[in-house]
Each structure stands twice: as structure tokens, then as C-alpha cells.
Amino acid sequence: MSQQQGYYQQGPPQQGYYQQGPPQQGYYQQGPPQQGYPQQQPVYVQQGQPKEESCLDSCLKCLCCCFLLELVCDN
């Protein structure tokens, strides 16, 4: 029981929950490099601010919904 009390009294780690520093030797983060193929760089997708919807877009969506509802409700 005294070991558990010591654990809880320590509080959260000061550097956060993620391991800091280089990865341990013998482990690859993206697998071993393949010979003859260049290593792929990570692809980052940049999300901009959402575009405002035009009146035409709104009307087309509304018409599609009305059409689908009419098809479903008629049967």
C-alpha cells in the first residue's frame, strides 16, 4: 500500500505524457528504409477557413432534398 501512496503523491510527469528525445535504437518509426526507393516525406494537408455557401449552392441542396423526400414519401 505504501508503494501506491508514493505513486499517487508524485503527481503528473513534468515533461508531459509523451516520450521526449530520439527513438530507442532498434525501432523504426516508419519501417526500415527500402533500398532503391526514396523515402517518402510526410504529407501535410492544410485546411483553410470554410468557404461561405452561395445562394445557388443552398438552393440546389434544398431541391435535391425535396426531390428525395418526394420520392420516398410517394411510395
From Swiss-Prot:
For this protein, the record's InterPro entries field holds: CYSTM_dom
Please provide the record's keywords in A-Z order.
Cell membrane, Lipoprotein, Membrane, Repeat
Does the UniProt entry include the keyword Membrane?
yes
* UniProt-annotated stretches for the region 3 X 10 AA tandem repeats of Q-Q-G-Y-Y-Q-Q-G-P-P: 4-33
Tell me the segments the record calls region Disordered.
Answer: 1-43
Q: Which GO terms describe its cellular component?
A: plasma membrane
The places in or outside the cell where this protein is found are: Cell membrane
Transmembrane ranges, per UniProt, are none
> Which residues does UniProt assign to the signal peptide?
none
Recorded topology in the membrane? Lipid-anchor
| Keyword Membrane applies | yes
Q: Which Pfam families match?
A: CYSTM (PF12734)
Which spans of this chain does UniProt mark as sequence repeats? Answer: 4-13, 14-23, 24-33
What does the entry report about post-translational modification of this chain? Palmitoylated near the C-terminus.
Miscellaneous comment in the UniProt entry for this protein: Present with 13100 molecules/cell in log phase SD medium.
Q: Which family does it belong to?
A: Belongs to the CYSTM1 family.
Official protein name in the record:
Lipid-anchored plasma membrane protein CPP2
